[in-house]
Swiss-Prot record:
PANTHER family: VALINE--TRNA LIGASE, CHLOROPLASTIC_MITOCHONDRIAL 2 (PTHR11946:SF93), VALYL-TRNA SYNTHETASES (PTHR11946). A motif ('HIGH' region) lies at residues 40-50. This is Valine--tRNA ligase. Keywords: Aminoacyl-tRNA synthetase, ATP-binding, Coiled coil, Cytoplasm, Ligase, Nucleotide-binding, Protein biosynthesis. Monomer. GO terms for biological process: valyl-tRNA aminoacylation. The lineage of its organism: Bacteria, Pseudomonadati, Pseudomonadota, Gammaproteobacteria, Chromatiales. CDD domains: Anticodon_Ia_Val, ValRS_core. Residues 855-926 form a coiled coil. GO terms for cellular component: cytosol. It comes from Nitrosococcus oceani (strain ATCC 19707 / BCRC 17464 / JCM 30415 / NCIMB 11848 / C-107). Its EC number is 6.1.1.9.
Amino acid sequence: MDKNYNPQAIEQYWYQIWEQKGYFTPQGKDSSYCIMIPPPNVTGHLHMGHAFQSTIMDALIRYHRMRGDDTLWQVGADHAGIATQMVVENQLNAEGKTRHDLGREAFIQRVWEWKEHSGGTITRQLRRMGTSVDWSRERFTMDEGLSQAVGEVFVRLYDEGLLYRGKRLVNWDSVLHTAISDLEVISEEENSHLWHMRYPLSDGSGHLVVATTRPETMLGDTAVAVHPEDPRYQHLIGKTVALPLTDRTIPVIADDYVEPEFGSGCVKITPAHDFNDYEVGQRHGLPFINIFTVDASLNENVPERYRNLDRFEARKLVVADLEAAGLLEKIEDHKLMVPRGDRSRTVIEPYLTDQWFVKTAPLAEPAIQAVENGQIRFIPENWNKIYFEWMRNIQDWCISRQIWWGHRIPAWYDPEGKIYVAPTETQARQKYNLPPDLPLEQDPDVLDTWFSSALWPFSTLGWPEDTSLLRAFYPTSVLVTGFDIIFFWVARMIMMGLKFTGEVPFHEVYIHGLVRDAEGQKMSKSKGNVLDPLDLIDGIDLETLVTKRTGGLMQPAMAKRIEKATRKEFPQGIPSFGCDALRFTFAILATRGRDIRFDLGRIEGYRNFCNKLWNAARYVLINVSSEISVERQGKPEQAEENLMLGAPERWIISRFHSTTQEVIEGIENYRFDRVAQAIYNFTWNEYCDWYLELSKPVLNNPASPEAAKRRTRHTLVHVLEALLRLAHPIIPFITEEIWQQVGPLAGRQGKTIMLQPYPQPEIDKIDEDAVAEIEWVIAFVTGVRSIRSQMNIAPGKPIPLLLQAGKAHDRTRLESNQKFLAALAKLDSIQWLKDETPPPAATALVDELKLLIPLAGLIDKEAELKRLDREMQRMRKDLARVQGKLANSNYVERAPAEIVAKERQRAQEVTAALSTLEQQHAEITDLNP
């Protein structure tokens, strides 16, 4: 092994080997385990959420592969209708063309060409994360087989009356000219106004005041609503008002939707341009007047003065005309949530248009029952409640989009507008017995991307055909996804899976939080806090990082602020941490919370962990390899039980099996934070810090019996080899690299750690007596080291130790482990005191046993007192500063709560440290000169 751990030298090498050898493909065993990757957009790039999610999925897949399951991790990409079309349209714009210049067929061909040459970047980047997906089965939602499944589902839903075309309100993007899903709408708080307008009563008896944030929509009002029990307006219910700026009158209606205490208690109702008003309009049979064109200009349904104006220009004119007519009561400053398209950034309009819809209520009921009866389990379980709430209030699903890239809707229209639904035109003519000369025109719309991705768990396995893969791997085992798409994707997969296969699409749904920055802020380009996982793996210099963060901003004015913050946070750029360190960090952060705070300091710590494991392996190989090879010549390997293991060996083996039990429980319960913590604690705090140290007095002492050396070497190798298998699902690269040398020494056959059996806890090998004995040794050595640290005694200086009190087992353990204690605690003598008074000494306790280190002659009394005086003076100043802040009521009341809490914690820590120093000062003062 190389002296230094260099992840770049091993990670891409091993991934190439694994993929070439076909280790990622199913092996055809009896017990199957399958995960479907949430298909990333074909336009996408790997972000922290993808990297986190892929770490969890890969850990599960590697674990089950090592458990002997036939594993399939299905990979693929989503065609991402709107996003992909925008990318290609932007390319055309740069050439001075539009998609209409090319025509539909040529444009679609251009998109396919882009996909072949530039799409799929993210799937290549997933390789860098070590994902053991079956690349030979990579799928795309526009593949021929998947397209066949989409057509089949559409036709069957239509034939069963579960799919219809109708005029309903949708989220309309006036730049892209298409309906979009709620997930593609980003609502952000913005400064605006609230306009209060007067609507005169038709009988001339007065007026009603209504307030709106969108005054231009008043031209589409068809009622004013009041609460039925509001005494101010009960006498007006059924009367009419003259709609300002028009020649229409509209009724005053009563509806519980109105909140009497909000504003004037009167609400303008615009059913064609507000989702709540739409419901009110349906309840009361109101007219639906659409006042917008597809590009959000005002249409022929408004007075001529306002026609063809952009909505925001129309707003200004409407407000001016209301004011001129004396019908503008007041204007207030107002903050409101403005819905914008996540790609176009335009304000989204609720828009009444003909669309295709799925009737979801009949599909939702079985999907609710599947979770209620335990066929599907959400982890954590608290997501059940949110799932049920969404599903019991489900609305029909708008599945049509007014773009060209996607699965074209398999519906045809004759000249009279009659609809014929079938996978192809030929099949439509056969199905409906249409004459060959009847002209048919296919619906120009395409299906919502979520429609095809709802079929992902079974369409990728060959449905509607009854394939061997479908039989082997469906239902799949678990879905790993974020909480933000439970409704958009998870619920729809459950509905579609049950409807078309009769079975649930997966048995468990592991819902994880969203990766945020160290302050808990969402990572976004505009905030300048985005971290690219590949930059953490391979490193990036400062100038490249600045260019990356400031390029392509929606708001270029933010560039200077982002550059300044980036230079401050990363003055040297970002160093290379390697993939394993990033994966370990993600695992340790995989708690049950909604937010995953990513702190760069954590990944540095886990890079050090990988380095620790590497150095431990080098120590083992240097001290063990040649001797074990010699021992093996012509001899079968000795079993542990024949080696007469000592307490240190029985202790580390016990701790390994306890850790294995903890790790397996963690994986089975999706507590990867506990898995990583258990592996970390055992590796660093037990195997490296203690067992390796306990091995040195045996291996480095020529007088040690050969049997003791043999059992030590055997244990070093076998525990390390098993530890590598235990940690492999989380940190696959470093474990493979080390295992290639350690595995054969431990008698393991095979070409890769990936296909080795996962360790199983052997409870009969947990030796509580050995655990208690070595824990005593650790406490003993730690006590001596603590005194050294407190009294500023050099770590390597041999010192005498006095013992007092204690029990019989303390003497027994001392006798059994004296060579370890003397070596690890650097003791030149150990002496039991009887009843005599000990000399001035620093003391530590191991249960009732007193450890005493006489200080006379060990330290320079005067120099040490001066050092302590300086340190105490510094601490008292620090404490006074903190206490002064906390005594200031203005500071405590106005400073952020987390800052005040940190200062209080600081005060406690400094007080405790000062108390310790004062005690040390007193002990040293009492020493004889």
